[in-house]
Amino acid sequence: DTHSDATRLEYADIVLDIDAHKVTRAGTPIHLSPTCFKLLRMLMERPGRVHSRERLLSRVWGGEVYVEQRTVDVHIRRLRKEINAQGSRDLIRTVRGVGYALDDHIGQ
């Protein structure tokens, strides 16, 4: 269910092209902000792994910038809205008090 090479990540029906900076879901292009693109890329690089808010902050925003942890929640909400816009199943799992994971088996 997961495939990746140097420039392309695939998970379920989501394809992320790193070099072209493009994302599609079920063949439909999805336009993401640079921050949401980085978040999705990080989640897709390790599907199933729960990423803490702290880890997401340091990898996506960089350790030099002070950003509140709830900023992660706001961007995850935006990312969910964009990748689920076509009525697709939500693949981002929230682990309360911990962080987020990309998970194809939510609620199964």
Regions found by a protein language model. Give the residues of each.
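Active-site beta-strand termini and strand-to-loop segments that position acidic
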Residues: 11, 25, 105
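Positively charged, aromatic-enriched patches within helix-turn-helix-type DNA-binding elements
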Residues: 20-22, 27-91, 96-98
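Basic, amphipathic DNA-recognition helix from helix-turn-helix-like DNA-binding domains
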Residues: 1-10
